């Protein structure tokens, strides 16, 4: 939906630009104004009062969305032997070691999440330049470097997402699909915001959550009331 298209303008007209909506109201509006041609992703953009240039204010983490993401998550697992067997049984889409590394060195990155056992990280170092810029590098902090590969696969396929503030102090995440019930979208948003608030850096001063906008992939943004920090799925 182009910003210059008639459909976008009609969708934008349904939103009061001077109003801030409750999470549930915003979810309903975003559903109503999303493209009807496909099941659009519902995204949240959060402006934080942090300075990402400071290591102790680099907000990043993971959260399990209670209602999932609505996406089919393709998982690549770097493991061998018994752990490779566990990964296959848990539903990993791609499992391997050297052959996976070589494939990625050749430019292949047809997966959404990479998980690795600790003993494979030396090999993965050879493809860090490929995985890193795409946000695919396994990391102990996000639970993707682990010996419990079955649990990690279950979590990411069940709705666990990673988030990280960017250089402009903005944080972006997908919290569901336009086909989701509005209450489920609001609950997913609440789970994400709760975790972001929980890990607030102690050195961050002033207003922490400055602005929140909810939107579909190509639809107009709806500003969400940052003061709502509980009962996200209730009527305003």
Curated annotation (Swiss-Prot):
Alphabetically ordered keywords of this record: Repressor, Ribonucleoprotein, Ribosomal protein, RNA-binding, rRNA-binding, Translation regulation, tRNA-binding
Gene3D superfamilies: 3.30.190.20, 3.40.50.790
Complex and partners: Part of the 50S ribosomal subunit.
Role played: Binds directly to 23S rRNA. The L1 stalk is quite mobile in the ribosome, and is involved in E site tRNA release.
Pfam families assigned to the protein according to its UniProt record, in alphabetical order: Ribosomal_L1
One GO-annotated biological process of the protein: regulation of translation
Disulphide-bonded residues: none
CDD domains listed in its UniProt record: Ribosomal_L1 (cd00403)
UniProt GO MF annotations: rRNA binding; structural constituent of ribosome; tRNA binding
The name this protein goes by in its record: Large ribosomal subunit protein uL1
Cellular component GO terms, alphabetical: large ribosomal subunit
Family: Belongs to the universal ribosomal protein uL1 family.
Keyword Repressor attributed: yes
